[in-house]
Amino acid sequence: MPTQEVKKHAVLPPIISRNDKEFLESMQRYIITETKRVGCNEEGPPDEYYTIYRNVFDKVIDYVNAYKSVLTSIKKEYDAFIETVKKGRRNAFYLHGKLKVLAAEPTALVYHQRRTIQLEAKMRIIDNNSKAIQLQIDQMKQLRMEYENTEVKLCASSKQLWKPIPGMTLQDSVNLDALNNHKQNLEDKCRKLKQDMSTMYVSAQKKADLDEEMIVLLKRRDIAENLNKDLRFRHQRLQVISHTLNSWMKQNMRIPFKDVLERIQQTKAIYGHAKVVDELFEDDPNKTKEAIVMLYYIERFHELISLGEYEKAACFAANSPKRILQNAGTMNKFKAIGKVRGKPLPLLLFFEAIFNTSQAFKRAINVDLTLEGIKCGLSEERLDLVTHWVTQAKLTFSEKVGDAICAYGEQHPYHKSKCLALAQIVYNECGLHKKAILCLCRQGQFHEAMEHIQQSKDINTDDLIQLITACPQIDLIRGLTEERNGKPPFLSFGLTVLHLFSVDMKKIGMKLLQEVSKAEKDVIEHLVMSDLFCSIEKWQELANICLQNGFKNLSNDIMSILRSQAGVSEISEDDTTNVMEHVFW
């Protein structure tokens, strides 16, 4: 066989084993699957391609043991080449950006130079304007100094030359006809004012003269009433005598005249018995007229109620003589009506009428009507009416009235401050100074509250403790525990803090301790030494509280101040020293 034929048969492709074929197919599937997963196209991105084929290369190296060292060297060179390519790309990108920056520098320099020229031009303009303004200011100052140094005297007539005439335009002020009309109007107004002064107003001397004249007339009236009473008594006595004589004449004078005279003398009316005189000689016409008027008011009131004229009925009740219709019965009538659709509440109309007319009477409206009226106004959301009644009407206040207003303020936070102010007025009128001070504190008016406490004599320490419990405000507690105008504080600082910690107001107590801890030691010493009500044991208890709540320095300061006092020593619990030993020896 020729040599060429032998070589031709020798280069036949080797037969691939089944395992190698499956391995190659799995690698091919892996490449396709990973390429689709990362979304690579045929042109890139290259980094994902490099990663996929690097993994395939690693698997091939692991699979082929015979060529592992050779393939590992090839892969190492392959990775080095790829890293060199990547580094070259990064350097190219960096150099490209740097090249752009270098190319843009001349343009930026030109822009900056142009902007510099513009700003310098603006600065020159501003400097010129500033110099001009400064020059004007200097000129004005010079003129003002010259004006102040020169005494200028103007005539009284020349003062009005530059002022416009009130009620006239500049054009009318130079028109003679308009000026004449304006003058005529002013003269008419002046004439009317003089007439009003003579008819509508009187001088204080005139009032004094009228008062004296009234006193004289009242004296005349008293004299005339006494004379009238005497004359009526005489008239009554003559009537009795006349009646007796007429009866005697009708009986044909069968009784002796002497007996008739005795019977006349025995009549009490002849001698003016007090009871007979009072019954017979009262002002009967006036009493009768007054009773008729009262009866008319009552009948008319019931008639208006039956007709549904509740507003008129309320006015009738308010204007009734001697307040005969301003009572609980009338209030119950209006309350029984209830609400009327499309109209104000009849009960509110009743209270509005009687409260608005209360100033016309000497006596104030009683407590029950006042309380019911305030409650009615608050239930109808008419705080404006309640405000007017409390400040202007003549009412009889009570503690329940103030409590009702405070409760309304708690239910309506928007009106709380106004309700507290009204309740304060009520409590002051009732003499309830504790509740009035609480209202001031809830309004944040702590300075006024301090003044009120200082003026009140019936407020003690327990009341102030209750006050800070009901209104735990730092400013209030600070005002109660600080000296005022050289006077000792109202409350002991130490006892106050201990009380706050005992009633679950730890936050307020912590704030007070925090403020004190920021002060100097001499201030703390003054606070401890000037506190006359807090004993040493209480201060030690307060120091322990400070230590438990993180105020170690304050606790140490308090204890050092206590130890520095003469005759004061700290005794531990384990010490067996007898405190009263010196007494028995």
UniProtKB/Swiss-Prot annotation:
Keywords: Coiled coil. The keyword Protease does not apply. It comes from the Eukaryota. Residues 118-239 form a coiled coil. InterPro entries: ARM-type_fold, Clathrin_H-chain_linker, CLHC1, TSNAXIP1_N. The keyword Coiled coil applies. SUPFAM superfamilies: ARM repeat (SSF48371). This is Clathrin heavy chain linker domain-containing protein 1. The gene is Clhc1.
